[in-house]
Amino acid sequence: MVRDPVNTVVAVDNDGTTTHVRTVKPMSRLNSTNSQNTVTFVDSKSNDKGNDRQTQPKKVPTGRLCQEGDTVDLDTPMSSHERRHLLFLATSRDRWRSHKVHNYCPACILRRPEYGLPCGHMYCEYDIRRLGRKIGRETYAVEECTCCQARFTDVVFKFRPKTKGIRVLALDGGGVRGIIMLQCLHMLQSMLWVFLPGMPIIDLFDVCAGTSSGEVEAGGVKKSGICALSLAHKGMSVKKAIQDFTDLSQRVFVSQPIWARAFNLIARGSIYGSSAIDEALKRHYGESKLSDYTPATARAAKILVTVKGTPKGDHILSNFNGVGLDNSHKDFEQTFCHPDDEEGQKAILAWEAARSTSAAPVIFPTFTIDGVGTFQDGAMWRNNPTDVALSLVPALTQGHCLPDILLSIGTGFEKRLQRGHREPQPPTRVTIPLIDLLRRLYAFMGDNIVTDGEKFHNHIMAGRSDVGSRFRRLNVPLSEGYPSLDDASSIPRLMDEAAAHFKSHPGLQEVLDSIISSFFYFEVSSRPIRHRTHVSFCGRILCDIQPGHRLKKFIKDLRIRGAEFSINGKFTALDSVGEWNGREVYFEIPVRGTVAGLHTQLEIFLCWNMLGRQSKEMISRSPFSLNEIMESQGWDSPQSRALRQPVRSG
């Protein structure tokens, strides 16, 4: 028999008092069925510190404090105008079967579409929620396309809860050094599987940004930009990505004598031709478009890769169709489909995006997407795409400017001598001027802040002190220096150096701690009540893991490690939840208390013991105010527009 998950309410008062209050009737959740029952609430002002007797709680009706009827979705039934429009779409299904649009959502004609269905039609998040069948918390199954009436099975979208922050993954470029990044993700995933067996590490991140090799690793060109496409868009496992990376690197980067490399460079402007890499990427990605229904769009993840226009222009190629970008972003352009595509038939293919961002000068020729432009390696603009991904956070989290965690992974760096310990430089040898020029240009490209991911990381940290502990950087010092971008023989050495470095480095454990704590988030259950001296609220701490064996094991392992929540400095253990069946019931802990005002910051931490080491990390989006949480939930928005986001027109 399944027991209710919660039989204790945590009451937190702004005078520093925390009390675990036994309810008259255990509540599986706060809903309209139990909201009229009387629960006990301890008034902190009635505590007598000089009396050891237990203070008698006073009873207050919970009809206004704890009704979930106000909280769940804030959705309203469709209006007559909306129903009439959907009926018109259904009657025009023959035309819509061959007509697809990418610049507006056909169901509402108000917003840009973000989520593609297997038939090729795209809808915005609001209408996916409206047209889909809700099968779980923030989870919707779409069984039919409104436009063409095509029917589907297993087309499910899981959206991020409104009050939950986002996790960002940024992957540097670096040719074959991209194997370092994959090895890092593999080791981090192994640590994660202790708590969440079988969960792909890439599924933890809401925004994935890559450049150069971070995206093609599985396509045969080993650069760091293609990982974002292979791991997230294609849903490839890290283990398979490592194997494909190694095999295809050796296939594409065929060893050539010096004279052959020089001849190819002079004859066609690159050491390698387009055919080898193009065919490898086509086989890997097929005809998949950035707009297709993929493992990434199924969990509402945003993927982007950076590319450099030729002769100029900075661009990102993404799967989110410009949603989240506004006119303030003047330093780069977003490209999703062919700008002259009126019929919606020319969305950019995944392999084209991978090929564009991997076109490293000298190594591969530039790549032209018909009707869009000619592009080269994104590392020429952003070898470390951290700031590009970070610029999207406010729009994706309704104004909250900081992610829960921003994980930036490098592809190795050379150890530099500390200031004051420089070795004397030998005098410059007399060389042929052209050769000397090429040598200096090569050295400049490798030591430039744009192409040196580690330098750019330090630059961001110096200018974004607000990011602080949320920004994690993982990289490996290379004892033998940088291998060339196409040196496939260096892959085993790079993997060994990465494994040895991260085995003893605390950085991976710190990243894991932040990820684990960010599974938990807070939302208000009813509208807070303003009193003369304070504001009382009713909320709950939730976990963004679906009920099942995975959730049950996750909570069990945290309990074993003595996990507890710190709410404004006061603690409540996970054991206070009592007996709970995580295979069938969502995790939640109701929290009631008082704060000085709606704008008062509320801090919630998850604390636990890991191998004798105490860990304390903020839950998702903490610290926050009640006003921020209410705004994210849409309390003060017109109900029919609560989920609608303003987007850039055009």
Please tell me what each predicted stretch does.
Residues 2-5, 14, 29-35, 41-43, ...:
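Conserved catalytic cores and adjacent C-terminal regulatory segments
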Residues 9-11, 18-21:
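Short linear proline/tyrosine/threonine-rich motifs used for host-factor recruitment
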